[in-house]
Amino acid sequence: MASKCPKCDKTVYFAEKVSSLGKDWHRFCLRCEHCSKTLTPGGHAEHDGKPFCHKPCYATLFGPKGVNIGGAGSYIYEKPSAEKPQVTGPIEVPVARTEERKASGPPKGPSKASSVTTFTGEPNMCPRCNKRVYFAEKVTSLGKDWHRPCLRCERCGKTLTPGGHAEHDGQPYCHKPCYGILFGPKGVNTGAVGSYIYDKDPEGKAQP
């Protein structure tokens, strides 16, 4: 039985289908969600089940702050303030916000996966080990700061390069074989991205 294309919601017949993200699409419906560029199965990024071209769209929308879209993995990291050294002890609430915090309740600590370093200079928490990430040891990916050794594939544990890996539900994965095996179309050939063995028409019926 023919499946429905997730882009146009129309029937996808065997001769016109491509498979990606575990779904069957019309060839020309597999487009970047942001710029509408036609994509190749296995040759694009994914976010919340939607396809995106790797650059510039995925890097611009979901990459770390300051990403250089001219080359994956090239980043301009924020420099620590020269006037305010990094705080290693308890966080102090700035004077300018004291009254505002009093009105809204007691101050809260930083989020474990804050996407940017807060303006007081205190380091963020690594989403992998839940420990503080200081400027000299951090890499930024998926909008979070990680220790360099902590940015690893969720499945195989391989160390990854910022901007050079896939993402699913906010977790990093190496493009192949792990992302292809877990989330790629059925029959993915992990030896070469974009090489697929499509399912034959299960009923062996001729095209309408």
From Swiss-Prot:
Coiled-coil intervals, chain numbering: none
UniProt xrefs under Pfam families: LIM (PF00412)
Annotated SUPFAM superfamilies: Glucocorticoid receptor-like (DNA-binding domain)
Biased composition (Low complexity): 104-115
Keywords: Acetylation, LIM domain, Metal-binding, Phosphoprotein, Repeat, Zinc
UniProt cross-references to CDD domains, sorted A to Z: LIM1_TLP, LIM_CRIP
Keyword Manganese: no
Residues that bear N6-acetyllysine: 23, 138, 144
Phosphoserine: modified positions: 104
Region entry Disordered, spans: 98-117
TM segment ranges: none
InterPro entries the record matches: Znf_LIM
Secretion signal span: none
Domain LIM zinc-binding: 5-57, 126-178
One MF term in the entry's GO annotations: metal ion binding
Self-association state and partner proteins as the record states: Interacts with TGFB1I1.
Protein name in the entry: Cysteine-rich protein 2
Biological source species: Bos taurus (Bovine)
Gene: CRIP2
